[in-house]
Structure formats: C-alpha cells, structure tokens
C-alpha cells in the first residue's frame, strides 16, 4: 500500500505532537520532583 507524502506527513504529525507533549509533561514533572 503506497503512502503519499501528505498522508505520511499527517501520520507523522499525528504521532509526534502528542508524544512531544507527553515528553514535555514528563520532563516537567521530573524536574519539579528533584
């Protein structure tokens, strides 16, 4: 199943944005605890 550039970019953003958000929260909570 070939994936066009728009579909690939949309999937990448759909996965990357929440992951960056969760990583940011994780780092924030860790820095607050220490």
UniProtKB/Swiss-Prot annotation:
SUPFAM superfamilies: Photosystem II reaction center protein M, PsbM. It is found in: Cellular thylakoid membrane. One of its GO terms (cellular component) is plasma membrane-derived thylakoid membrane. Keywords: Membrane, Photosynthesis, Photosystem II, Reaction center, Thylakoid, Transmembrane, Transmembrane helix. It is a single-pass membrane protein. Its main location: membrane. It holds the Pfam family PsbM. It comes from the Bacteria. GO terms for biological process: photosynthesis, light reaction. The chain crosses the membrane at residues 7-27. One of the components of the core complex of photosystem II (PSII). PSII is a light-driven water:plastoquinone oxidoreductase that uses light energy to abstract electrons from H(2)O, generating O(2) and a proton gradient subsequently used for ATP formation. It consists of a core antenna complex that captures photons, and an electron transfer chain that converts photonic excitation into a charge separation. This subunit is found at the monomer-monomer interface. PSII is composed of 1 copy each of membrane proteins PsbA, PsbB, PsbC, PsbD, PsbE, PsbF, PsbH, PsbI, PsbJ, PsbK, PsbL, PsbM, PsbT, PsbX, PsbY, Psb30/Ycf12, peripheral proteins PsbO, CyanoQ (PsbQ), PsbU, PsbV and a large number of cofactors. It forms dimeric complexes. Belongs to the PsbM family. This is Photosystem II reaction center protein M. It comes from Prochlorococcus marinus (strain MIT 9313).
């Amino acid at each position: 199943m070939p994936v066009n550039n728009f579909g690939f970019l949309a999937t990448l953003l759909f996965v990357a944005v929440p992951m960056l958000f969760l990583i940011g929260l994780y780092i924030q909570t860790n820095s607050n605890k220490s």
